[in-house]
Each structure stands twice: as structure tokens, then as C-alpha cells.
């Protein structure tokens, strides 16, 4: 575990006990102290993680309650929408029936109109023939004036017939006009009905869009609440990180302050020495002045002494320059030490940031592992409930068996077990189940005797399963069952596919019979895969039989741990939760 090591503060000069310790011993003591501090911090982290888990569980309960409320509201809206949709469908059906009746009547009117047209054409042809005859009679009249008396009678009769025909033509024209008027009225009614039908369709589409917008708004509000919860947790993490960095900054500021005080003490002591030297130099200079004042009278005799004093003054000046150089070097060293300390502080900050990143990654891994463990626990509990086993630490059914005759007794405890008393070494068969699903359909159960396979729709929507295929594999053999094109598995419904010799009567849609297969088959390793109409795997379940030799309680417990590990490996890697069957 990487940890930031703070620079050691200098030990007091007078500590004899510390001087007696070796550097190795000092390093061990420092490491021990660092480990103690790290353990304390780890304990604080663990307590915080537990509190966060408690808060997370409370938030999950609140989210589940909110989802239930939203589900009830959505179900109410769904019922209201379905009622309105049923009314609209009923109205549409009535309109369709009326339209069919009108179409039938229109067909009859068209047939009558065609008959009238044919009769009119016939009468028109007769009129043309009569006119021809009239012209012939007139020609005959002109040609034969002698036959006028006899022809007048024929003429009157022909004229009367002509009048009758004209009256019939007028009546037919009136009937044709009435038929045309009725046709126009029926056409207007048809257009009106079509417009009403179109308006009803548009109203239905509008209601559907409103319903979808309400669903999207509800989902958006739900996602907004989840984002607000995640942002609150992020703020809390940032606050904790700021507090930790603040504590580290205060510690290093204290250490830098200690270094600064030591350097100031050293600088003060050296400055005091220089000041004392300067005072001594001042005293000497005063003495020299007095001597010079006294030696004015003795210039000739004391010139050599003045030269010596000048040499001493130059020596003191050199000493002052040397001390100034030393002071500048000390200042430079102090700047270097400060720069080194700042670099170490930056490195420690980077290390702390890396540690926090590692901690967040470990926390994410821990959450994923907790979800996986919860999923495995739920899966094992469901298997124990299905097999009517009492809760235990592992999902295993142990059956002891031997080849010789023996007495069998059943005991009750945390785990149901059938013990076989015999003198020989006994063997146990462990049955482990693993399942996963990526869609709405999951494989709930595989009968170990090969009688049935049970599926369940875990979603709140109906699932069409036309063209879906279920494949059973036992070793190198396989068999496939394909659903009909119209089969639909209702929301929350369970369907059982029975073998032909299971002795069960078909009861669609919950119980189906595979007439072409007498048994689903039995074996040590049974695997069932469910594929959709595109050939994509949406669910799978496997049952593994493992035979072990029971030679003692300790070996039995080790076998249980190995079986649990096999179950975990069959479920999928914990680092890939999307491939496992998460039971919420």
C-alpha cells in the first residue's frame, strides 16, 4: 500500500537516547508509527464506507418506493388510455360498418343506373327507327296521295305511339335526375364519413403522442433525481478530499515552520557573533583613534605601529566579507531547502491523489462485488427454495451413495443432507446451477430428470417469441425447440415446455408439449441456451453434476468452497457484471 512519508523533524541535540539508537532501529520505529497511522486511517475509511453503505441502502429503498408510486400512476394512465382506445376502436368499427353498408347501396344504385342507361339506349334506337318509318310514310304520302285516307289512320297511330314514347323518355329523364341527385348525396355522405374517420385517427395519434411525452417526462424526472443523488455524493467526496488535503497542508506547514525557526535561530546566532565581532572592532577602532590622537605627537616614532593597525583593519574587513559570503550561502541553502520541501509537498499531494483514486477504484470494485455477492446469494436462495432446502452457506445438494447395501437416515440442520452409513468410502454428487439473461426472458428451471424446462418473462411488457429457438446441450448431443410464429409470453408469466412422456396435458400458453421429443435428456453437464429470431443468445442456464469422495469434515468443507468457486466462475467474472444474472 503506497503511503506518503512525511519528512522527519530534526531531533534535539541533547537527546542521548536517540543518539544511542541505530539508523535501522529509527527507521523501524518510523515505519511502525506510519503503519499505526495508516491503520487508524484505514479504520476511519472502513467506518465511512459502512455509513455510506447504510445511506445507499436507505436511498435505494426510497428509489424503490418512488418507482412503485410511478408504476401505479403509469398503470392508472395506461388503463385510462386503454379505455379511450377501446372507445375509439369501437367508433372506428361502427364507422367501417356504415361505410360498408353505403358501399353496398352505392353498388345497387350503380347497377340500376346501368339498367336505366341500357333501356334508354333501346328506346332511343326505337325512336330512331320510328322516325325512319315516319319519313318513309311521308315519302309514300307524297308519292301516293291516292292512299292518303288509309295512310292517315296509320299516321295517327304512329303519332300516338310517338307521344307515348316521348312521355316515357321524359319519365326516364326525371328518374335519371333523381338517381344522379341520390348519387351526389351518397358521395357527400361518404366524404363526410371519411373525414370523420380521419379526424378520429388523428385524435388517436395525438393521444398516443401525449402519452409517450408523459412517459418521457416521468423518466426524465427520475433520471434527474438519480443525477442529483450522484452529484450530492460527488460533492461529499470532494469535501472529504479537501479536508484531507487541508490536514496534510497543515502538517507540512508546521514542519516548514519548524525548519524556518531553526534556520532563523542559526541565522540569529551567527548574526550575534558578527555583531559582537563588530562591537569588538568598534572598540579596537576607538582605541586606534585614541592612539592616533596620542600619536600625533609621536608620528615619527609610531608610524610602524599605524601600519600594523591598518593591516589588522584590512584583516577584519576580509573577515566581514567572508561572513557576508557565508550569510549569502546560508540564504541560498535555505531557498534550496524550501524548494525541496515544496517539491516533497507536491509529490505527497500527488501520492495522496493517487491513493484517493485507488480508493475510489477499490470502492467501485467493492460495490460491484457486493452486487455480485447479493446476486449469487439471491440465486442460491431461489435454488434452495425451489429444491425445498433450508438456507445454508452454499447452494448444494449432497447425496451420499455406495455400491453395497446400507442404511439411510435423514438429518435436519442448516443444510438438508442424506447421510449413508457404510464401512467403505462414500461419494457425493454436487449439483450446481448457473444462469444469465440479457433480455426480458430468463430460464428459471431445468428438470434434472429431463421432463421440463421453465421460462419466465421478468419484464412488465409482453414478449413475442415467434421464431425463437431453445437449444439443449448434453455433452456432444443437442436438441432444439422452436416456438410458433404467433406465440407471445405475457408480462410476468411463466411457461413450461414439457417432454412428450412427462404425462402432462397441454394448457397453452403456460404449459406446452414438445411432441417430437420424449425427454429433454439427462446427463452430468446440461446446458440450455435461448436464442431470439435473429439468432442472438438472450439467456442461458447450466446444471453441473460433480462427484467427490467424502473422507472427512475438513475435506467436505474444502469441497464446498471449491463448488462455490465453480458456481462463481460459471456465473461470470465479478469485474463484468453485465454478463451475470443480477437479482434486484
Curated annotation (Swiss-Prot):
* Domain of life the protein comes from: Eukaryota
Cysteine methyl ester sites (modified residues): 581
- Show the segment(s) annotated as Coil 1B: 81-218
Sequence segments annotated as region (Disordered): 1-22, 388-431, 548-584
Places the protein is found: Nucleus lamina; Nucleus envelope; Nucleus, Nucleoplasm; Nucleus matrix
Major location category of this protein: nucleus
Could you tell me where the Acidic residues compositional bias lies?
551-565
One MF term in GO for this entry? structural constituent of cytoskeleton
One cellular component (GO) term of this entry = nuclear lamina
Region called Tail, residue ranges: 386-584
Q: How is it modified after translation?
A: Phosphorylation plays a key role in lamin organization, subcellular localization and nuclear envelope disintegration. Phosphorylation by CDK1 at Ser-22 at the onset of mitosis drives lamin disassembly and nuclear envelope breakdown.
- Show the segment(s) annotated as Coil 1A: 34-70
Q: What residues does the annotated propeptide cover?
A: 582-584
Biased-composition ranges, Low complexity, are 394-408
Give residue spans, biased composition: Basic and acidic residues: 575-584
Q: Where in this chain does the record put each IF rod domain?
A: 31-387
Keywords of this entry: Coiled coil, Intermediate filament, Lipoprotein, Methylation, Nucleus, Phosphoprotein, Prenylation
Please list where the region (Coil 2) is annotated: 243-385
**Which residues in this protein are found as Phosphoserine?**
22
The short sequence motif called Nuclear localization signal sits at: 414-419
Report any one BP term from Gene Ontology. protein localization to nuclear envelope
Task: Quote the InterPro entries the UniProt record gives.
Answer: IF_conserved, IF_rod_dom, Lamin_tail_dom, Lamin_tail_dom_sf
The UniProt function text for this chain reads: Lamins are intermediate filament proteins that assemble into a filamentous meshwork, and which constitute the major components of the nuclear lamina, a fibrous layer on the nucleoplasmic side of the inner nuclear membrane. Lamins provide a framework for the nuclear envelope, bridging the nuclear envelope and chromatin. Plays an important role in nuclear assembly, chromatin organization, nuclear membrane and telomere dynamics.
Tell me the protein's name: Lamin-B1
Which organism's genome codes for this protein? Gallus gallus
Q: Name the gene for this chain.
A: LMNB1
Amino acid at each position: 500500500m503506497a503511503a506518503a512519508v512525511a519528512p522527519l523533524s530534526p531531533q534535539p541535540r541533547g537527546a542521548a537516547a536517540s543518539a544511542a539508537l541505530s539508523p535501522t532501529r529509527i527507521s523501524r520505529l518510523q515505519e511502525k508509527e506510519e503503519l499505526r497511522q495508516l491503520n487508524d486511517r484505514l479504520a476511519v475509511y472502513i467506518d465511512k464506507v459502512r455509513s455510506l453503505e447504510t445511506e445507499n441502502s436507505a436511498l435505494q429503498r426510497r428509489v424503490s418506493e418512488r418507482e412503485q408510486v410511478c408504476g401505479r400512476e403509469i398503470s392508472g394512465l395506461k388503463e385510462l388510455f386503454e379505455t379511450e382506445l377501446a372507445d375509439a376502436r369501437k367508433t372506428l368499427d361502427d364507422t367501417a360498418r356504415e361505410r360498408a353498408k353505403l358501399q353496398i347501396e352505392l353498388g345497387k344504385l350503380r347497377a340500376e343506373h346501368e339498367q336505366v342507361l341500357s333501356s334508354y339506349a333501346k328506346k332511343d334506337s326505337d325512336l330512331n327507327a320510328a322516325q325512319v318509318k315516319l319519313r318513309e310514310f311521308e315519302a309514300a304520302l307524297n308519292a301516293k296521295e291516292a292512299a292518303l285516307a288509309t295512310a292517315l289512320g296509320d299516321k295517327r297511330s304512329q303519332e300516338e305511339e310517338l307521344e307515348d314514347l316521348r312521355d316515357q323518355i321524359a319519365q326516364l329523364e326525371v328518374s335519371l335526375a333523381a338517381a344522379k341527385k341520390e348519387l351526389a348525396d351518397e358521395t357527400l355522405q361518404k366524404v363526410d364519413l371519411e373525414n370523420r374517420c380521419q379526424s378520429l385517427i388523428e385524435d388517436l395519434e395525438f393521444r398516443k403522442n401525449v402519452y409517450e411525452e408523459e412517459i418521457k417526462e416521468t423518466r426524465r424526472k427520475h433520471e434527474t433525481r438519480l443525477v442529483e443523488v450522484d452529484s450530492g455524493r460527488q460533492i461529499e467526496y470532494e469535501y472529504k478530499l479537501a479536508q484531507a488535503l487541508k490536514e496534510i497542508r497543515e502538517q507540512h506547514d508546521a514542519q516548514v515552520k519548524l525548519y524556518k525557526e531553526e534556520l532563523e535561530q542559526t541565522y540569529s546566532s551567527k548574526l550575534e557573533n558578527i555583531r559582537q565581532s563588530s562591537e569588538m572592532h568598534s572598540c579596537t577602532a576607538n582605541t586606534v583613534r585614541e592612539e592616533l590622537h596620542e600619536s600625533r605627537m609621536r608620528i615619527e616614532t609610531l608610524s610602524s605601529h599605524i601600519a600594523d593597525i591598518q593591516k589588522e583593519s584590512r584583516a577584519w574587513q576580509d573577515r566581514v566579507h567572508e561572513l557576508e559570503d557565508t550569510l549569502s550561502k546560508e540564504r541560498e541553502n535555505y531557498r534550496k531547502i524550501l524548494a525541496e520541501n515544496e517539491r516533497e509537498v507536491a509529490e505527497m499531494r500527488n501520492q495522496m491523489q493517487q491513493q484517493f483514486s485507488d480508493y475510489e477504484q477499490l470502492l467501485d470494485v467493492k460495490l460491484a462485488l457486493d452486487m455480485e455477492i447479493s446476486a449469487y446469494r439471491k440465486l442460491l436462495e431461489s435454488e434452495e427454495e425451489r429444491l425445498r432446502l433450508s438456507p445454508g452457506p452454499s447452494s448444494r445438494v449432497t447425496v451420499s451413495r455406495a455400491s453395497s447395501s446400507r442404511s439411510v437416515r435423514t438429518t435436519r440442520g442448516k443444510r438438508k443432507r442424506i447421510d449413508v452409513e457404510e464401512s467403505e468410502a462414500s461419494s457425493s454428487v454436487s449439483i450446481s446451477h448457473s444462469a444469465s439473461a440479457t433480455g426480458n426472458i430468463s430460464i428459471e428451471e431445468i428438470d434434472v430428470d429431463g421432463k421440463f424446462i421453465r421460462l419466465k418473462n421478468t419484464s412488465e411488457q409482453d414478449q413475442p417469441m415467434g421464431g425463437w429457438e431453445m437449444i439443449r446441450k448434453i455433452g456432444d448431443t443437442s436438441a432444439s425447440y422452436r416456438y410458433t410464429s404467433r406465440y407471445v409470453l405475457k408480462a410476468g408469466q411463466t411457461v413450461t415446455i414439457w417432454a412428450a412422456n412427462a404425462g402432462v396435458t397441454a394448457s397453452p400458453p403456460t404449459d406446452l408439449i414438445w411432441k417430437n421429443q420424449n425427454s429433454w435428456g439427462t446427463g452430468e453437464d446440461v446446458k440450455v441456451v435461448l436464442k431470439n429470431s435473429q439468432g442472438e443468445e438472450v439467456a442461458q442456464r447450466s446444471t453441473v453434476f460433480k462427484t467427490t469422495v467424502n473422507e472427512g469434515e475438513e475435506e467436505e468443507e474444502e469441497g464446498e468452497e471449491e463448488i462455490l468457486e465453480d458456481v462463481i466462475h460459471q456465473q461470470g467474472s465479478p469485474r463484468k457484471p453485465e454478463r451475470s444474472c443480477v437479482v434486484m
